[in-house]
């Protein structure tokens, strides 16, 4: 019952302004307008590859929820939208369904309603260290089967676990367990953050292990803020105060893309505070191969306007591409751009090129 309440708390708090903290620094990235693009808007091609699978836009539905009746209804709506628009979809952490088989349906609705698009299974790093290699392989297999996954994501959420009232901040040995997941999965492995970003140093340690890094940068939904609000409601004053102290902790998404690009050089997925198709195109210009959005789509789903929100994002991507003269998604990387003082200073101090 406690984990059910936590899952629903996360849904309501993530969709509210309480969860929104800081800036991802996309305002620090200015794409240079091309007044002579030499193409028609109708010629712009937004098709992209998501870990080998062709999709209709360089954009997907990020990890959100699962495990409760409300979560199941939301996942069904998100999956229908992913299928309609031909874009990938992550599910939220599947641990709850692995220990409570009666809630598996809240994840299985995704493969039922999105049979043809890439789906991403999702497990949390702290739970990996509890399992031996055989049990971990079983969990991976079940998580994959539950959603007919094209890829498996392992989420790194050290900051969230450190402030969560029920947190499990156990991260010793996680990298070795991620390697076990890679062997067991038999499909692309994504290692992702959940709102505090990936540094160059961590990205370098994931080279040769992860098939993709999802930076999950700072400047959007903050699980530190969410857990702080939950702690306050539960009267857990120590956790509330720690959350208040650390709610601005993390690497802004724009900087994290550059960090990951420098340390890793492979397939990078941008997430964290992306609030428009223009933000997404800026992320691609910085070096990401793909981007996802979560909070705006969760809020839209709860308000019954999910289709309109995704239509808008795709149209914004296409418009931004047209205005920088990018006919294909690959062309975005060569778009001229200017950086604001905060991002420029970060790159200089960290010795990064982006």
Swiss-Prot record:
Cell location:
Cytoplasm
Q: Which residues bind FMN?
A: 63-65, 93, 122, 192, 221, 273-275, 294-295
Which E.C. number(s) belong to this protein?
5.3.3.2
Primary localisation category: cytoplasm
Q: Which residues bind substrate?
A: 6-7, 93-95, 160
GO biological process terms, semicolon-separated: isoprenoid biosynthetic process
Look up the record and name the cofactor or cofactors this protein needs. Answer: FMN; NADPH; Mg(2+)
Q: Tell me the keywords, alphabetical order.
A: Cytoplasm, Flavoprotein, FMN, Isomerase, Isoprene biosynthesis, Magnesium, Metal-binding, NADP
Tell me what reaction this enzyme catalyses: isopentenyl diphosphate = dimethylallyl diphosphate
Which enzyme class, named as a word?
isomerase
Keyword check for tRNA-binding = no
Gene Ontology cellular-component annotations: cytoplasm
Q: Which residues does the record give as Mg(2+) binding sites?
A: 161
GO molecular function terms here? FMN binding; isopentenyl-diphosphate delta-isomerase activity; magnesium ion binding; NADPH binding; oxidoreductase activity
Main role? Answer: Involved in the biosynthesis of isoprenoids. Catalyzes the 1,3-allylic rearrangement of the homoallylic substrate isopentenyl (IPP) to its allylic isomer, dimethylallyl diphosphate (DMAPP).
Task: Family membership, please give it.
Answer: Belongs to the IPP isomerase type 2 family.
Q: How does it assemble?
A: Homooctamer. Dimer of tetramers.
User: By its UniProt entry, which HAMAP family does this protein fall under?
Assistant: Idi_2
Note the PANTHER family from the entry: ISOPENTENYL-DIPHOSPHATE DELTA-ISOMERASE
Q: What is this protein called?
A: Isopentenyl-diphosphate delta-isomerase
């Amino acid at each position: 019952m406690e984990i059910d309440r936590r899952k629903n708390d996360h849904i309501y708090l993530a969709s509210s302004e309480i969860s929104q903290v800081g800036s991802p620094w996309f305002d620090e990235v200015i794409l240079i307008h091309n007044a002579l693009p030499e193409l028609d808007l109708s010629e712009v091609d937004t098709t992209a590859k998501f870990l080998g699978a062709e999709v209709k836009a360089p954009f997907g539905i990020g990890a959100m929820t699962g495990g409760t009746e409300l979560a199941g209804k939301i996942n069904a709506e998100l999956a229908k939208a992913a299928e309609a628009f031909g874009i990938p979809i992550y599910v939220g952490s599947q641990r709850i369904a692995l220990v409570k088989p009666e809630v598996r349906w809240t994840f299985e609705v995704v493969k039922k309603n999105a049979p043809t698009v890439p789906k991403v299974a999702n497990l949390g790093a702290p739970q990996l260290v509890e399992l031996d290699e055989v049990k971990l392989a079983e969990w991976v297999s079940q998580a994959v089967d539950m959603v007919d996954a094209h890829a498996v994501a392992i989420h790194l959420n050290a900051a969230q676990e450190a402030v969560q009232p029920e947190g499990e901040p156990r991260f010793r040995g996680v990298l070795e367990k991620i390697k076990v997941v890679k062997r067991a999965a038999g499909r692309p492995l994504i290692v992702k953050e959940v709102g505090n970003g990936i540094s160059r140093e961590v990205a370098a340690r994931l080279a040769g292990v992860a098939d993709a890094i999802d930076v999950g940068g700072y400047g959007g939904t903050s699980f530190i803020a969410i857990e702080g609000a939950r702690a306050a409601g539960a009267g857990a004053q120590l956790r509330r105060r720690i959350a208040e102290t650390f709610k601005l902790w993390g690497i802004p998404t724009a900087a994290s893309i550059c960090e990951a690009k420098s340390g890793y050089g492979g397939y990078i997925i941008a997430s964290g505070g992306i609030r428009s198709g223009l933000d997404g195109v800026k992320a691609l210009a910085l070096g990401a191969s793909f981007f996802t959005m979560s909070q705006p789509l969760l809020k839209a789903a709860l308000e019954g306007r999910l289709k309109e929100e995704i239509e808008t994002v795709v149209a914004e991507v296409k418009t931004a591409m047209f205005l920088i003269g990018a006919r294909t998604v690959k062309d975005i990387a060569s778009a001229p751009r200017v950086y604001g003082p905060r991002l420029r200073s970060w790159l200089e101090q960290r010795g990064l090129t982006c």
